[in-house]
Regions:
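Acidic/polar loop patches that form or flank catalytic/metal-binding clefts of enzymes
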Residues: 159-163, 186-188, 265-269
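A short, flexible helix-boundary coil/loop motif
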Residues: 233, 238, 263-280
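Polybasic low-complexity intrinsically disordered regions
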Residues: 7-180
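A short, polar/proline- and glycine-enriched secondary-structure boundary/capping micro-motif
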Residues: 141-146, 197-198, 276-277
Length: 280
């Protein structure tokens, strides 16, 4: 009944069901790929600005991974028999690394892997709204999508002047890109930048000491919290579909829901509690 009321339908009129939504999503993907969903995300950001939501100068960029909708062991057996993989777009990627000690007590670094995809996103630190995103296979490096996210943010006219991200974005080309676009650099530096002795060491030390860098690093955690909400409450930890474009569909719908929840809180002071069903 609430859905019928929202759509302006009479009590005795038929409401749309899951098959209607499936057909709708399929038609949009066939006609315009993901452009419609990207425009919808941008429209929500535009409406937020129109309603007076404050956007700060700091943007946080990061990626999160989603496990492919594949039984890896069964898939490997199928491929050994000459069959195609269930999801040809998914790939192995590095989830993270951790320190262990071997039998002799010497420290070693081990990597943890996943099979699936990545969502790369940019979030405004003050508003807590996701302003742009793109998706990739799990083996793609994070820094490869940084410039695309920045350009998408700037195209929306957001009052951004600083970008922060973890060490995966410590790429000389990205530092130059930010400088060329007159943006402050708060990308977390790898230790070797300031530990090595060369003529460039002072440049990196000066960057680390800057107010914009320090503020960006302090607030970088916020996007990890947003990703945690996406996985915990909206099922982004695992792909609902097969294929990159359908994974991107899941990511856009999840980001849209996260933004709408955030807007309700910012404009009405009403929080959403409990685990929601995945929307994609």
């Amino acid at each position: 009944m609430p859905a019928k009321y929202f759509l302006g339908l009479g009590v005795d009129e038929k409401a749309p069901d899951h098959t209607t939504l499936t057909a709708f999503k399929k038609r949009i993907l066939e006609n315009g790929k993901l452009a419609a969903y990207e425009q919808l995300l941008q429209e929500i950001v535009r409406l937020a600005v129109e309603k007076g939501v404050k956007f700060g100068a700091l943007q946080i960029v990061d990626s999160t991974h989603s496990i492919a909708n594949v039984n890896v062991q069964q898939d490997e057996r199928r491929q050994r028999k000459g069959q195609l993989p269930r999801d040809s777009g998914a790939s192995w990627g590095v989830k993270g690394s951790y320190k262990v000690r071997d039998e002799e007590g010497k420290p070693q670094e081990r990597r943890e892997y996943f099979y699936g995809y990545k969502m790369h996103a940019s979030m405004n630190a003050q508003s807590g709204l996701i302003t742009s995103l793109c998706c990739s296979s799990g083996n793609r490096p994070d820094n490869e999508y940084f410039c695309r996210l920045v350009q998408a943010d700037l195209a929306q006219g957001l009052p951004v002047d600083t970008y922060t991200g973890d060490r995966a974005y410590d790429d000389s080309e990205l530092h130059v890109f930010l400088q060329a676009n007159h943006l402050h650099d708060a990308l977390k530096l790898n230790d070797y930048r300031t530990q090595k002795k060369d003529v460039h060491k002072g440049v990196w030390e000066e960057l680390q000491a800057s107010e914009h860098y320090q503020n960006g690093i302090r607030q970088r955690y916020q996007i990890e919290r947003k990703f945690g909400e996406a996985k915990r409450e909206h099922g982004l930890g695992r792909c609902r579909y097969v294929g990159l474009i359908r994974y991107a569909l899941q990511c856009f719908l999840t980001a849209i829901v996260l933004n709408l929840k955030r807007l309700v809180w910012l404009l009405r002071g009403v929080p959403f509690k409990g685990r929601a069903r995945a929307v994609a």
